[in-house]
Design a protein with these regions (language model features):
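A general secondary-structure boundary signal
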Residues: 188, 205-207, 218
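Substrate-binding clefts and catalytic carboxylate motifs of secreted carbohydrate-active enzymes
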Residues: 1-164, 170, 181
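Hydrophobic beta-strand positions in extracellular immunoglobulin-like domains
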Residues: 146, 162, 191-193, 208
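Short beta-strand elements
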Residues: 178, 211-223
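Intrinsically disordered, low-complexity Pro/Gly/Ser/Thr-rich segments with frequent PxxP/GP/PP motifs
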Residues: 168-197
């Protein structure tokens, strides 16, 4: 265990596909020539109609990767913190589309600010589990924990709910806890998944009652 704090440097840097609608924002001396070249190449391959899908899908994947990596840091007892390159795209050296904001600090529409704060904040509640893809009728197990840098948060109540996309609640667990420094193991939860006839989305939602501390995980239940 290190005796001095270790802070990770520029973690993440997950790329998103270019959003060609951004080209029209460059109204001054700086032009998005790189985006224009990318668009031209895509058009030559007959794939330009898929550009919007490429942008949205790659963006959602990048957001999920950032969430996974930041939560890994928050769960670690051996790291003192982390630094990401930026939450906006970096256009200073070539093309680095690594942000959830574009080069103009505008949202790309991939995630809201409140959703980002679920896993990037001074207090983050999290769940550990083996897989995001679950078999119908099986048992889903998760461990819940809190990374807390709020001096006024001494205790609280965790509310953990697993819900299907149609609103049906599979199960709910409430657990009081005492905050133990910066890291608190709250409890283990277990839910029996229902039988389904098609791939079905489920959401594992966590919140600390009476606070803005919350998080959620999108899961898939398969027949």
């Amino acid at each position: 265990i290190p005796e001095v704090p270790i802070v990770t440097h520029e973690i993440g840097q997950y790329e998103t596909y270019p959003n060609f609608k951004e080209i029209e924002k460059y109204t001054g001396s700086l032009k998005a020539r790189n985006f224009e070249v990318f668009r031209e190449r895509l058009d030559e391959k007959g794939l330009l109609p898929l550009a919007e899908d490429y942008f949205k899908c790659s963006g959602k994947l990048a957001v999920q990767c950032y969430k996974e990596e930041m939560e890994a840091v928050f769960r670690s007892r051996l790291l003192g913190g982390f630094q990401i390159l930026d939450i906006q795209d970096f256009s200073g050296q070539g093309t680095a589309l690594v942000g959830v904001l574009d080069a103009f600090m505008d949202s790309k529409g991939l995630i809201t600010d409140s959703e980002w704060r679920e896993f990037c904040n001074d207090a983050v509640v999290m769940a550990r589990f083996d897989s995001y893809v679950l078999e119908a009728g099986s048992s889903f197990k998760a461990h819940t924990e809190l990374c807390n840098y709020r001096p006024d948060l001494k205790d609280g109540k965790l509310i953990c709910t697993l819900t299907l996309e149609n609103g049906d609640v599979i199960g709910k667990v409430e657990k009081n806890f005492i905050a133990e420094g910066n890291y608190t193991d709250i409890c283990d939860v277990e839910f029996t998944l229902p039988q389904v006839t098609k791939n079905t989305k489920a959401v594992l939602a966590l919140e600390i009652e009476g606070t803005d501390i919350r998080n959620h995980y999108d899961l898939w239940v398969i027949p």
